[in-house]
Amino acid sequence: LKIFHNAMYDVLWIRRLGLTVHGTIVDTMTVSSLVNENRFRYDLNSVAKEYTGLGKNESALNMAAKEWGVDPKAEMYKLPAMYVGEYAEKDAEITLALWQELKKEINMQDLHTIVTLEQQVFPCLVDMKWKGVRVSEDQVDVLEKKLQATYDLCIKRIKAATGISPEIWAAKSIAKVCDKLGVKYDRTEKTGAPSFTKNSFARSKNLVVKSIATARQMDKLKNTFLHSIRNFVYNGRIHSDIHQLRGDQGGTVTGRLSYSHPNLQQLPNYSPIGMGIRSIFIPEEGCQWGCFDYSQQEPRLVIHYAMNTPGVTGLGEIVAQYEKGDADFHQIVADIADLERREAKTINLGLFYGMGQAKLQAQLGIDDTDTAQALLKQYHSAVPFVKQLIKSVMDRAQRKGRIRTLGGRYCRFDMWEPKQFGMHKPLTFEQAETEIGIGNMKRAFTYKALNKLIQGSAADMTKQAMINLHKEGIVPMIQLHDELDISVENEKQSNKIIEIMKDAIPLDIPNKV
């Protein structure tokens, strides 16, 4: 075993020196996140103090850095080894001691399967970071001009219709445009200030309001995404930071990967503008860019779990459709419940993500509460298994304080709140016991239980696919939601990638890529 804390940083620096780390790599930062994904801090000092009582003494390092006029962390490499050596030795000592304690937690919590999965995916992530993604800077220039031209045209239309050149990110400025047009808009409950969300723009049928939404999109893509890409290009490639799990620099509690510097997961979908943005990324020489995504990964996971939950009803027709071959979950639900596909998809995903009725109503664009309630009643009558599964997973989270994903990852519910309905500040068990009382408290956030189960299981499946691909010498360029983008050599390799991804973690219904 080779034991690190924040292994990605160390392993990449070692590789930069021309050396290779062989054997199984253990990252105590990753393991500490698997042991408890809800910690506030994951730095070595914080985690080690909790589990070992040991901590760093950085006084000598800070003193030396002050004398040399450098930042003790960011510019440590500028200090002579005599000043850094003792600090590094202590780091190694603490990391080893931490690993000895974390091994006990792995055994107590039965985390061997998920720890192994995260250890096995790590070499793939290192290669992804090291290799980077090729970027066409010429295409970035072309896109910036196109986005600016579209933005200018939108502002011109708005001014022609209202005489106002709006500040598109200022709600008060947009409100003036709407007032001039006689268009109603939402206001915040607390202050009554104008409120404009993505959903409110999507609901509007006014062409001028839609121009504001388009201008916002163009501005964000140009000044946030493309600007960020340009800043991080090095020798024609970008080498984003990849966050394997929750940590101090980013990451998710469900196990899904995240990116920073830049955040490649801000890539738009496959709309025309999205395809334009994606065109800045180019494959290796002689290859084609391949996008391999799990078809409706989350709905398939919902059906898989529903099939394995006692007492769940109304699955027959949907399972039959999947077993016949390709199936569109949202369309099947729409047909069964006599809804439009858009309505069915909005309700499906809203319930999977733990949305309440008020938010779902807003997503559906329905102003009348009675109408929204009737629509949801119609949905639940036709497809009762969704509500039944949500309740089953919530009950398990409430009863056990945690749920477990396909790959053995725990999602924990360690905060507490009063049993009575209302808005409450989540508390630790000790705080809740004192302020609320044992008989009057329940676990908080269990309404998110199904979402965490789905997201965590999707992460397990995608990471297992990446492990299996890496064993075949295939290194993904980008991992994005339920998609792997890969530089593909030929059709034979493309078919191989599809089969590897489909078979990564079998479900009780057919998977599709």
Go through the PLM ranges and name each one:
Residues 383, 499-509:
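A common structural junction motif
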Residues 1-46, 50, 148, 303, ...:
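Conserved RNase H-like, two-metal-ion catalytic cores of nucleic-acid enzymes
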Residues 298-336, 421-440:
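Metal-dependent catalytic core segments for phosphate chemistry
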Residues 1-6, 165-167, 293, 359, ...:
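Short glycine-rich phosphate-binding loop at a beta-alpha junction
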Residues 90-96, 295, 447-470:
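Conserved pre-motif C helix in the palm subdomain of viral-like polymerases
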Residues 489-493:
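Helix N-cap motif at beta-to-alpha junctions
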Residues 28-29, 76-84, 133-141, 280-289, ...:
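Glycine- and acidic
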Residues 22, 39, 49-275, 282, ...:
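Conserved "right-hand" nucleotidyltransferase catalytic core of DNA-directed polymerases
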